[in-house]
Amino acid sequence: MLSWALAFLVIALIAAVFGFGGIASASAGIAQILFFIFLVMFVVALILRAVRG
């Protein structure tokens, strides 16, 4: 259980560095691009699965 707490602490610290630093705007732009790419991939996978049955 302590290992989970330490893992989440590290994730929170990394998020704080990105959030409070100047990297936030660049990260947000990259996140938006990745969101749309994965959204398109999800829709394509759904269509292929529906076609194959």
Swiss-Prot record:
InterPro entries linked to this entry: DUF1328 (IPR009760)
Compartment(s): Cell membrane
Keywords: Cell membrane, Membrane, Transmembrane, Transmembrane helix
Presence of keyword Transmembrane: yes
Major place of residence: membrane
Record GO cellular component, one term: plasma membrane
Highest taxon listed in the record's lineage: Bacteria
Membrane topology: Multi-pass membrane protein
Pfam families: DUF1328
Residue spans crossing the bilayer: 4-24, 29-48
Signal sequence region: none
UniProt family annotation: Belongs to the UPF0391 family.
Protein name as it appears in the record: UPF0391 membrane protein TM1040_2720
